[in-house]
Amino acid sequence: MAVRRALIVLAHAERTSFNYAMKEAAVEALKKKGWEVVESDLYAMNFNPLISRNDITGEPKDSENFQYPVESSLAYKEGRLSPDIVAEQKKLEAADLVIFQFPLYWFGVPAILKGWFERVLVAGFAYTYATMYDKGPFQNKKTLLSITTGGSGSMYSLQGVHGDMNVILWPIQSGILRFCGFQVLEPQLVYSIGHTPPDARVQVLEGWKKRLETVWEESPLYFAPSSLFDLNFQAGFLLKKEVQEEQKKNKFGLSVGHHLGKSIPADNQIKARK
């Protein structure tokens, strides 16, 4: 059987942090099960999160009206992206599983990780309008977010002051990962880590390692398949008419983002369908 390969992308500056401990636990657990593990420790690498003309070697197609999405896509096709971007793309291409380990900052990913997404996941490499979502280039890869928060789980609940965690996760899990084709697994959520005692932290790490023993067998989260949509500009990339009619019978929407003005399916971005 072919060896599985994992890429762990860490976005935390401190080696004494719980995020670093989670990364180390993941490396240990996966290697123990025979995985090859590659890391991208973004702060340790001093990864540049800023998109710019420097991401492209050679002359741009239009230097007077430089459009990064156009120029970076062309540079990818012509092999003119900067070496640091190419190195990350090669890691991503080789990986079967990608784990993103980070603290939740302002209801999103840290800036350095956002920059990694913007610079590495260029058009042509990670997506096109013809190959996106379940038709995306990474449709045979699995991914998951491993996140720590400052607030408690109740703060991110339906009645919590921060609002539903499912809604917070949607832009990342659907708008970035699923958009590129990934099968998105249930997120690993560690709430209120700053107020978690040492013995409980050990239990969290052990539970994380236990999960990773069988992570490849996990079912992904549900996202509305592209077959439900008319995927062309003339139709506006909308749900097919017959799908819209069929969905009128259902109490719940399809997902967090495709709620259709109805109640959102419970834990759509946290738990896989049984």
From Swiss-Prot:
Keyword annotations of the record: Acetylation, Cytoplasm, FAD, Flavoprotein, Isopeptide bond, NAD, NADP, Oxidoreductase, Phosphoprotein, Ubl conjugation
Cellular localization per UniProt: Cytoplasm, Cytosol
Protein residues bound to substrate: 126-128
UniProt crosslink position (Glycyl lysine isopeptide (Lys-Gly) (interchain with G-Cter in SUMO2)): 251
GO biological processes: cell redox homeostasis; cellular response to hydrogen peroxide; cellular response to metal ion; cellular response to oxidative stress; innate immune response; negative regulation of apoptotic process; negative regulation of ferroptosis; negative regulation of protein catabolic process
Single annotated GO MF: identical protein binding
Effect of residue 105 to Q: Decreases the catalytic efficiency toward menadione and nitrobenzene substrates
Induction text: By polycyclic hydrocarbons (Governed by the aromatic hydrocarbon-responsive (AH) locus).
Cofactor dependency: FAD
GO cellular component: cytoplasm; cytosol; dendrite; neuronal cell body; nucleus
Enzyme type, top EC level: oxidoreductase
Modified residues (Phosphoserine): 82
Predominant localisation class: cytoplasm
Catalytic activity: a quinone + NADH + H(+) = a quinol + NAD(+); a quinone + NADPH + H(+) = a quinol + NADP(+); ubiquinone-10 + NADH + H(+) = ubiquinol-10 + NAD(+); menadione + NADH + H(+) = menadiol + NAD(+)
Stretches for region Important for apoenzyme conformational stability: 225-274
Record PTM N-acetylalanine, positions in chain: 2
Pfam families, A to Z: Flavodoxin_2 (PF02525)
PANTHER family assigned: NAD P H OXIDOREDUCTASE-RELATED, NAD(P)H DEHYDROGENASE [QUINONE] 1
Summary of subunit composition and partner proteins: Homodimer. Interacts with PDLIM4 isoform 2; this interaction stabilizes PDLIM4 isoform 2 in response to oxidative stress and protects it from ubiquitin-independent degradation by the core 20S proteasome. Interacts with TP73 (via SAM domain); this interaction is NADH-dependent, stabilizes TP73 in response to oxidative stress and protects it from ubiquitin-independent degradation by the 20S proteasome. Interacts with TP53; this interaction is NADH-dependent, stabilizes TP53 in response to oxidative stress and protects it from ubiquitin-independent degradation by the 20S proteasome.
Note: Quinone reductase accepts electrons from both NADH and NADPH with equal efficiency. This protein is inhibited by dicoumarol.
Family: Belongs to the NAD(P)H dehydrogenase (quinone) family.
Physiological role: Flavin-containing quinone reductase that catalyzes two-electron reduction of quinones to hydroquinones using either NADH or NADPH as electron donors. In a ping-pong kinetic mechanism, the electrons are sequentially transferred from NAD(P)H to flavin cofactor and then from reduced flavin to the quinone, bypassing the formation of semiquinone and reactive oxygen species. Regulates cellular redox state primarily through quinone detoxification. Reduces components of plasma membrane redox system such as coenzyme Q and vitamin quinones, producing antioxidant hydroquinone forms.
UniProt name for this protein: NAD(P)H dehydrogenase [quinone] 1
Source organism of the structure: Rattus norvegicus
